[in-house]
Amino acid sequence: MSTIKKSGIITICGRPNVGKSTLTNALVGEKIAIVSNKPQTTRNRIYGVVNRGDTQFILLDTPGLHKPKSALGDYMVKVVTSSLADVDCALLLVEPIPHVGAPEKALIERVKEEKIPCILCINKIDTVEPAELLPVIAAYNEAWDGFDAIIPISAHSRSGLDDLMQELQKYAQEGPQLFPDGETTDQPERQVLGELLRGKLLL
């Protein structure tokens, strides 16, 4: 019998190549999303499923935030913004750079409009010294002082992921299990294999 009593729908947003797919794969525990150094490798929302204790998390891995330059790019940006509808929490994933760009500011404004809890995740902390994170945190706090939490992580090395999952527990809602035990994605197996092959071709 399932012990799941709560669920949380979490959308992961950020610029291309900031590590959204790496984070999704790390939290799920297997590779369901493309990881590539080429931008816009995730074209649709990918649902990852993570069971932790009595809670089931549904992760929405979205395309990267960018200024669209094509019909496909425009569609991908719409996927990002639509993913903020009916979620319990948004993760803004950023690199450890002390600058808040236009894409991040636009997402912050959308989160404020929707009144969605938002966690700032500073990724790739394994590439900088701890002291270098302070100006990054200061820059984002200056842009918006409404983040519900700021959590430094490394999706690659898994550093900080336990802290992140513990924070996400706060936003889970009482309710039924949405996906069966053992299911890690809503994507058909054939589509997952196709996406992973596409990821290899993009490397």
Report each predicted region and the residues it spans.
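Long, well-ordered amphipathic alpha-helical subdomains in the mid-to-C-terminal portions
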Residues: G182-L203
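Conserved G1/Walker A P-loop phosphate-binding module
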Residues: M1-C89, V94
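Conserved C-terminal guanine-recognition region of P-loop GTPase G domains, centered on the G4
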Residues: N51, Q56, K78-I150
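Canonical P-loop GTPase G-domain recognition
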Residues: I116-P117, D126-E189
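Conserved nucleotide-binding/hydrolysis micro-motifs of P-loop NTPases
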Residues: P39-T41, P63-H66, P96-V100, I125-V128, ...
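Conserved, well-folded catalytic cores of nucleic-acid-processing
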Residues: E30, V49-G53, P68, S83-A90, ...
